[in-house]
Amino acid sequence: MNDSYFHEFGFGLAYKDGYFYATLATAINPGGASTQPQIQDRGKVIKVNKTNGELSFVASGLRTPNGIGIGCKGDLFVADNQGDWLPSSKIVHVREGAWFGSRSVDPEGTKDKKEDLPVVWLPQDEIGNSPSTPLAIDLGPYKGQMIHGEVTHGGIKRVFVEEVNGQLQGCVFRFIQGLEAGVNRIAWGPGGDLYVGGIGNPGNWGQAGKLHYGLQRLVYNNKSTFEMLAVRAKSNGMEIEFTEPLEEGDGWNTDHYEVKQWYYKPTIEYGGPKLNEKKLTIKSASVSDDRKKVFLEFDGLKDNHMVYIHLKKHFISDSGSSIWSTEAWYTMNQVPKGQNGVIKKAPFVYADNTLTDAEKKAGWQLLFDGKSMAGWRNFKKKTVGKGWVISENAIHLDAKPNKDGHWQAVDGGDIITDKSYENYEFTVNWKINNCGNSGIIFNVVEKDKYDYVWQTGPEMQVLDNTCHPDSKFVTHRAGDLYDMIECKYSTVKPAGEWNEARIKSLDGKVDFWLNGYKVVSFTMHDDQWKKMVAGSKFKDMPDFGLAKGGHISLQDHGDKVWFKNIKIKELKQNKQ
């Protein structure tokens, strides 16, 4: 509710131990500046005695505290929204006598007052814009954490909280999206389900493209999601905990992480920039024995700063799940003292075109050692054409225009593995030249009656999606099952950057992965497969997609392309 002053809302209620709690927003002029003067009761947390109705003030210094709720350990928390004296939105811990930094109600009286720091800052438009209703979550691996709604940024966010030197601080993650409206209220129902109230308004208050109203019920399905569960502060870096173990041998490469640090300074101006933003150099990455934690060692952590962690590699869990979100925002009110993270020596030194001991033990084989083309040859030939060379530690098609107008490169042509494979997992890193086209073709049959690998083998497309003509066609883009199934997500990197591709084929069930995302799944040889082939450009090729195994091919489509870290693991056929 609100009175005649713009934005002078009252928010709540939360109930705890015989008292109702609410928050009172300050009055705001059109445009966002605080009204002057303010009523002295504004920007406060109030509590009301359930029995006799007596009202008292608990905390002050808030701006637009849209939501108060019971969070972790049964304490009260408030979501406050960006504005003057508030450089970004935040979640605060309600304590008796706390003052949260807004000076608009009493500019002179609060001039020298020390602000109670937020549990988490919510960097504007990165992980928040209009936060609402903090609540505890007591389900699955998230027990002891908090969630809150978001009106404009949308969805529900999750907050891990820890106590450092008596001060609560923590990390915020993406959690839930895809709801029907911006989220203004969330509440747990008597059966343990989460009820979500949506809202919106024309202009800049509401999630773009969503309804301006809504009520939805979310039910926890007891299924695991692979994601960052927690990020913890250490004296010498940060520790990331995942909900599932990483793949064997993964997580040790410092190039797969990015860490930045900055701080905010409240002023009378609306919002505020990131100040002294710096990228921190990661000295080492250490993986725990259970592969569920990674400690990032780096110098330069400072009190009263934000620490941003980005997983540059889209990790895959040991069970084959793609990670849900790759970013975390930690509010470092205080750097812990005497709490160093565990630094371990990496079990291997990563190098292109090599296998780790763990990979060897798991059955992986190299198909390219970075030194020779052994194991590869042109389709229906015994050697590799001179157009294929070794460059940048990769098999490279140094494509030169064909003067006779042929679409393939001079002395190039498609190359194939010497050996045929049926049930396997295949991985490769590839990059393509500007506006280039290539492909990874599998189940290739080599017989005299076939002139090209694609007369029998399906293709995982390799493409520069930005400017190759094929990018205009759905199912012709990078990662697609060419001309049949488009990617679920667009995950390809720009031309000139390395992509990680994976093909898993087992008993006719095939998955394509691109840069850590499972982008395409299908089953070969069933009625649906036959229907897809009949509707594709391969419909007049009688043997297309019929083979249960075959050679793996790297395509010459007349454009420069590179392939490295080419590995395969043969899989056992499932018992029928």
For each feature predicted by the language model, list its residue ranges:
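Surface-exposed acidic, glycine/proline-enriched linker/cap segments
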Residues: 42, 103-127, 269-279, 478-487, ...
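A short glycine/threonine-centered beta-strand motif
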Residues: 237-250, 298, 311, 367-373
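Short, surface-exposed alpha-helix to beta-strand junction/turn motifs within ectodomains of secreted
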Residues: 245-284, 310-317, 326-330
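Blade-terminus and WD-like Trp-Asp/Gly-His loop motifs, strongest in beta-propeller folds
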Residues: 287-290
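Surface-exposed, short loops/turns at beta-strand junctions within beta-sandwich domains
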Residues: 300-305
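Carbohydrate-interacting regions of secretory-pathway proteins
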Residues: 342-576
